[in-house]
Structures are given as structure tokens and as C-alpha cells.
Amino acid sequence: MADDHAAAADLVDGGRPEGDTHSREDGLSKPRDKDREREKDKDRERHRDRDRDRGRDRDRDKDKEKDRDKERDRDRDRDKDRDRHHRHHRERREHRDRSDDHDRHRSRDSERRRDHERDGRRRHRSRSRSRSRGRDRRSRSRSRSKSKRVSGFDMAPPAQAVVPQFPAIPTPSQFPGTAIPGMFPNMLPMGVGQFNPLVIQPQAMTQQATRHARRVYVGGLPPTANEQSVAIYFNQVMAAIGGNTAGPGDAVLNVYINHDKKFAFVEMRSVEEASNAMALDGILFEGAPVKVRRPTDYNPSLAAALGPSQPSPNLNLAAVGLTPGSAGGLEGPDRIFVGGLPYYFTEAQVRELLESFGPLRGFDLVKDRETGNSKGYAFCVYQDLNVTDIACAALNGIKMGDKTLTVRRANQGAAQPRPEQESILLQAQQQVQLQKLVYQVGALPTKVVCLTQVVSADELKDDEEYEDIMEDMRLEAGKYGNLIKVVIPRPDPSGLPVAGVGKVFLEYADVDGATKAKTAMHGRKFGGNPVVAVFYPENKFSSAEYDA
């Protein structure tokens, strides 16, 4: 049975022997191993691929991270650039704002400067300013606000009107001696004052006063003159005429020259030598005759105590071509200096004042060489030398407008008038003549007010400036009454003289308006220049006579 079962098993197994079975199994396992190896290789390949892919992914991630970093850097740079741009824009805007503020301030400053320059052109009377400044001022806008400066009047009228103060002349009851027939105390409208102009207040002698007594004025110098040439010339001339009385050496210590005005101040080493130099008036210097005078600050009272005030009679003037007694015309012991004259006084008015004491032998109202305007002082000599001291005593110290007259002998200390000169008749004549002068210079009320020394000829030449001044005058003058007419004479383009240039005439409907205007305007400043307001004769104004 067992054998049968074994045989059956062998049949089941294919009827092959056992050894054959093992060989067959080995043959089948090899391909399987190869397949497994191949699978393993594939797995390894897949792992490598995965690793490679993961590596690539990591590289890509790194690249992406780098890109993100770069993007962040770019964003950061863009933010910085944007911030920088905004900051720069903000700074530019702030700079523009500051610049605009600066421009506005500068514009306001420029406007103030233009207003100030407009005042300056009326205040500064040197006449040497360039026309280019005038062009700049004229280019300002005509539409500027009037609230800044209503008119050229730069100050309000004072609480008490500054009106011209005329001399207080004594009444006949104050004169020594008996009363004058026909003279009454109420004859003059002027106040009563003490008549004592002869009192001279003593002053301490100073070195400055000594220096002034040693200086002489030399005018009319040629353009080629300089300090050295003037000093050498006067040293030689003083030695030639025997004027070096202080001993050997040069008489001239110092020379100051004003080249624009062509004059010099020559300082001598002694008062006596300065007095000797006065004899050289009219001498030729480099072919031109020169004037030799005392300076305006010369004080004869102090100088008289320092030494001779007149040239020595022993000078040899013929040695330098001069004739004794001929120099100067107005020179001499009776020559009178009249200082403190109001600038608006004409030559005729000054003559009228001086001739109230008698006819004049010589008269010279000193004027500016460039403008022709009065400098406020004059010299005169009377035909009758006996009235010299009377005139000095009567006129010295009196008020004329806003000025006080200084009247004295020009070349020596003040002398006391002789008793026979102090006649009551002459003093009465003085009262009458001064009263007449007061009415002449504008004390009698009229409908016309004249403002003097208000504008210059240069300002009136330009049409726009002229209209500005005219507008200012209308605005201001119209405040005080019914203003009928404003007249401002202008220079002639051809250079011909025109009467009244520098004056402003205001015509009112009645005397009351003119009086208010005169009271309010007198003493104020127009363009920095003091205004002098006087009444003007209506008949002369209506006939266009503007030089009265």
C-alpha cells in the first residue's frame, strides 16, 4: 500500500523523479532573482530620482528663497527710494515755502525800501544821486496800497502848530529917552520882548576855538589842486609877503580839500598868520583867482582875544601881484556876516531886511554852486559905516521862521555901538521895516498857501514822479478846506529858468481853509524835508508870478 501511495505521489508530481524537481526549481528562481534585482535597481533608481528631485526641489526652494530675498531687497530699496523721494519732495516743498516766505518778506522789504527811497529822494538834497535810482523808484507799481503811506507827509502835525516866529521888537515905551511922536504901543502886531542883543555871553577858550581862528577858507580852486600843491603855494606866498610872523618855517600846518566843491580849509600855525592870509583874497592859484575867507564857524569874539583879526598893514602884497585894499570887495572891518537865514528867503527879501538900516555898498547871498539854492547866510557892507553896529545889534538873535539870525562883524570881535548911533529914530525905523518884512514873507492871510523847499527839480522832471507828488499834495491839502487848485512849477526841458521850481502852491476857496492848511502843514516833513508854509499874494498867484 505504501508503495502504491508513493507511486501515486510520483504521478501527482508529474511522474518526474525528485532530482528533476530541484533542478527545475533552481531554474525558475534565477529569473525571479533577476527580476527582484531589477526591481531593487528600479527602487534604487526611483530613490535616486526622488533624492535628485528632492535636491532639485531644495535648489528651487533655495532659488525661490533667494528670489524672495532679492525681491524683499528690491522692495526695501524701493521703499528707501520712495522715502527718499518723499523726503526730497517734502524738503523741496518746505524750501519753496521758505523761499516764498522769503520772497514775500523781500517783497515787503522792497516795498518798504521803495517807500523809504521815495522819502529819501526828497530828503537827500545833495543832487549827486544817480538817475538810475530814480528810474528804480519810478518803476514801482502805481497800484500799491495807500494804507501803507497815505501821502508823502511822514509825520502828523504837532499838537501846537509850528508857525513862523518873527522878532519880538520893543515898543517905544521901552526905548531910552522920550517917546516918539506918532508912534503908539499897539502899532505892531508882534509881541513885546527885551531888546538887549549886545550882551555877549563869555565862553571858555578852547583849543577847538583856537584852531578855528587859525583856519582860512579858500574857494574856487582849479580841479588840479591837491593838498600838497595848496600847502606849498601858501607857504611860498606867505613868506613872499612877509606874513610869517610866528618865526621861521612853514606857515601852513594842514590842508583839507573838498574836490567836489573845489574849496579847501588851510590851517595856519598862528592866529596872526591866519589874519595875514586874509589879505590874499583874489590871488591867482594855477591861473585861477581864489577866494580867501574866514570859515563860517569863525568866532570873532573869541578870536579877538587870541591875536590880530586884521591883516598886518606892513604886508608886501605887491610882491605877489596884489594891490593893498583891493582884495575881496566885501572885505574889511565893516563887513557883516548874516547867518541863520531861512533857506526859502530870496535875495530880494534878505536885501529888504538889511536895507531897512540903510543902502548897501555890497551884498552877497551865498548859494550852492550846483543847485543855486541859498545856503542860509550872506555878507554885506553898508554905504554908511556908522550903521554897521546898529544893524548887528538889532538883527542878531531874532527869530525868522524856524531860524535864529546870527549877525556880526565878519572880521573882528563885536564892537559896542557908539552912543550917537543909538538914536531912537533909527530903532523906530527898524520896527517899521521889520513889520513890512513880516508881511512880505507871508504873515498876512490869503487864500493861497505856498510850501517851499518841498521837492527838487530832478523829481519834477519825471512825469510819474510829478503825478505822485501832485496826488500826495491833493490828498493832504484837501483835508483842511475846499481846495480849488494845486500848482507845482516844473523845470523847462530846454533848461530855461522857471520861476517857483521847488515850491507848491495851494489855492483854497476861502481864507479859513488856507489858514488851517498853513497851520497844519508848517513844520511837518514831506519826504523827510521840513515844510515851510507861508501865505502867498493872491494877485501874484493869479498872474502866475511864482517868484515873489
Swiss-Prot record:
InterPro entries: Nucleotide-bd_a/b_plait_sf (IPR012677), RBD_domain_sf (IPR035979), RRM_dom (IPR000504), RRM_dom_euk (IPR003954), U2AF_lg (IPR006529). Residues 214-297, 334-412, 453-539 form the RRM domain. Residues 1-82, 94-120 have a biased composition (Basic and acidic residues). GO terms for cellular component: commitment complex; nuclear speck; U2-type prespliceosome; U2AF complex. Its main location: nucleus. CDD domains: RRM1_U2AF65 (cd12230), RRM2_U2AF65 (cd12231), RRM3_U2AF65 (cd12232). GO terms for biological process: spliceosomal complex assembly. The keyword Ion transport does not apply. Residues 83-93, 121-149 have a biased composition (Basic residues). N-terminal RS domain has a very strong bias in favor of D over S. Necessary for the splicing of pre-mRNA. This is Splicing factor U2af large subunit B. The gene is U2AF65B.
